[in-house]
């Protein structure tokens, strides 16, 4: 018991040390008034494996109407088209004006939860919303604030902001409403402004995109479900095999038991009895014979005695014979 406690304590210490290696990125408030969403580009982040990011659904304010959003993890082509019609992956829904709550993303390569998010280094991942900030437009699957206000997050996992310039992911021309947000430099996890090192912009197709990451995410889940299904099938087959084997063994045991019962003698031998007279034969034996199954039973039996040679008896009993017949030989 003491050893188990020490092991649990060691595991807890290791977990805290591993958790301390990552850092908490600056939370992102999902609101149209957030100046971090740059017009035509969105918000670019450079998280590392082990980091955490909180997306905040703010509490409603009486001075302005509450904004309703449904956030999705999307592929690059979905982000460019501002469309979540095909294969939507919902992360969080901001639809409770009475309270503020957070959705935490932990950037980890392997998730202990089979429905958890998994990330790979040097790949891009995308978050956006196609809602239009109203309750009626919460379920919109096209356009929305992704198109009008560039409310999207580009997460470049394990990448250096000074080595790779952020791509200009312009989907469509933003509306005039979005122009009043102003253009502010995007800050990475090192709290430094993202600068263009002077390299020419390259095509998005030449770089790792979130499509592979999201596809890998779904493929890993499919593999887990397939493995679970295969294990269940194998387990069921083993159970069926054991049940069939048990039934066969029980049938065989019953068959042997019936054969042994049928092989029992139909008569009972009495003890040999010696006569008190001196002139009587020493091999006098009284044998009671009784039929058990049928009224007519031809029977051949060998009887051994302690006072002479073996005696063989052949009997044929008609149906009207009494139950017990005694022969003196």
From Swiss-Prot:
Subunit relationships: Interacts with TLE4 through the PDZ-binding motif.
Domain annotation Ephrin RBD: ranges: 23-157
The organism's taxonomic lineage, starting at the top: Eukaryota, Metazoa, Chordata, Craniata, Vertebrata
One GO term of the biological process aspect: axon guidance
Gene name linked to the record: efnb1
Annotated InterPro entries: Cupredoxin, Ephrin, Ephrin-B_Ecto, Ephrin_CS, Ephrin_RBD
UniProt-annotated stretches for the region Disordered: 163-192
Tissue: Expressed at low levels in most tissues with highest levels in the kidney, oocytes, ovary and testis.
Cleavable signal peptide: 1-20
UniProt superkingdom: Eukaryota
Annotated localization: Membrane
Recorded coiled-coil stretches: none
Annotated disulfide bonds: 57-94, 82-146
Any one Pfam family match given in the protein's UniProt record, by short name: Ephrin
Annotated motif PDZ-binding, positions: 327-329
Identification of the protein by name: Ephrin-B1
Keywords linked to the UniProt accession: Developmental protein, Differentiation, Disulfide bond, Glycoprotein, Membrane, Neurogenesis, Phosphoprotein, Signal, Transmembrane, Transmembrane helix
Sequence intervals crossing the membrane: 227-247
Function: Cell surface transmembrane ligand for Eph receptors, a family of receptor tyrosine kinases which are crucial for migration, repulsion and adhesion during neuronal, vascular and epithelial development. Binds promiscuously Eph receptors residing on adjacent cells, leading to contact-dependent bidirectional signaling into neighboring cells. The signaling pathway downstream of the receptor is referred to as forward signaling while the signaling pathway downstream of the ephrin ligand is referred to as reverse signaling. May have a role in the developing mesenchymal and nervous tissue.
Protein's UniProt keywords contain Transferase: no
GO CC, alphabetical: glutamatergic synapse; plasma membrane; presynaptic membrane
GO terms of molecular function: ephrin receptor binding
Positions on the Cytoplasmic side per record topology: 248-329
Residues exposed to the Extracellular side: 21-226
Modification comment: Inducible phosphorylation of tyrosine residues in the cytoplasmic domain. Tyrosine phosphorylation inhibits TLE4-binding.
Similarity field: Belongs to the ephrin family.
Domain notes: The PDZ-binding motif is required for TLE4-binding.
Membrane topology listed for this record: Single-pass type I membrane protein
């Amino acid at each position: 018991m003491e050893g188990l406690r020490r092991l649990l304590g060691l595991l807890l210490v290791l977990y805290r040390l591993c958790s301390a290696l990552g850092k908490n990125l600056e939370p992102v408030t999902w609101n149209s008034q957030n100046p971090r969403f740059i017009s035509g580009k969105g918000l670019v982040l450079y998280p590392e494996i082990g980091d955490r990011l909180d997306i905040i659904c703010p509490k409603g304010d009486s001075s302005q109407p509450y904004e309703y959003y449904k956030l999705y993890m999307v592929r690059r082509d979905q982000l460019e088209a501002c469309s979540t019609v095909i294969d939507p992956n919902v992360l969080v829904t901001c639809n409770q004006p009475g309270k503020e709550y957070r959705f935490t993303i932990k950037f980890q390569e392997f998730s202990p939860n089979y429905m958890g998010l998994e990330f790979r280094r040097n790949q891009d991942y995308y978050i956006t919303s196609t809602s239009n900030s109203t309750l009626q437009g919460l379920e919109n699957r096209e356009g929305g604030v992704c198109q009008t206000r560039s409310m999207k997050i580009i997460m470049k996992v394990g990448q250096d902001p000074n080595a790779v310039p952020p791509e200009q992911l312009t989907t469509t021309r933003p509306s005039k409403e979005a122009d009043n947000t102003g253009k502010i430099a995007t800050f990475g996890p090192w709290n430094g402004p993202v600068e263009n090192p002077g390299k020419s912009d390259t095509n998005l197709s030449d770089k790792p995109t979130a499509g592979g990451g999201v596809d890998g995410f779904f493929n890993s889940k499919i593999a887990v479900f397939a493995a679970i299904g295969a294990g269940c099938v194998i387990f069921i087959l083993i159970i069926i095999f054991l049940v069939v084997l048990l039934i066969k063994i029980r049938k065989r045991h019953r068959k042997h038991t019936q054969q042994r019962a049928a092989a029992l003698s139909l008569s009972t031998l009495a003890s040999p009895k010696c006569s008190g007279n001196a002139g009587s034969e020493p091999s006098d034996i009284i044998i009671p014979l009784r039929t058990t199954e049928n009224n007519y039973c031809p029977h051949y039996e060998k009887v051994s005695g302690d006072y002479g040679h073996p005696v063989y008896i052949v009997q044929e009993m008609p149906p009207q014979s009494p139950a017990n017949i005694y022969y003196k030989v």
